[in-house]
Amino acid sequence: MMNLNKLLAVMVIVFPMTIAAFEVTGDHFKDTFKITSVTAHEDGTSFNAESDSAGQYGKVYLTYNLKSSNSSRNSGTWIGYGRGISPEGNLAIGNLMGVWTRDGSIISIKSLDEVTDGINFMQGTMDLISGE
């Protein structure tokens, strides 16, 4: 029993340090997506967006399905789907999932996405007034 207590104590100390050491590395790009349509549902809102030059993915089409987690509708979770076609004709397909918050007309999103070429971390904002 004493060894189990020691093991738990070590895990409590080491685990938070491991989380703090997380770093995102690898290829990255910045881009602006234009919201092309918005659909309101009883349990959430769907956004379709596109970009002509999303890094190695080229022309990209996205769908975000946002669901609120509280009555004030200022945060929640979302799932989505993406399709990209590079200038060389390479097709990329993505399953997207993350969290969102809203401050006025700005929605901030973060996600971990499973894409044809691996796992991607994404963060960005959507301005509901400008559509970008």
Model-derived features: positions:
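Bacterial N-terminal signal peptides that target proteins for export
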Residues: 1-8
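Bacterial N-terminal signal peptides
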Residues: 8-18
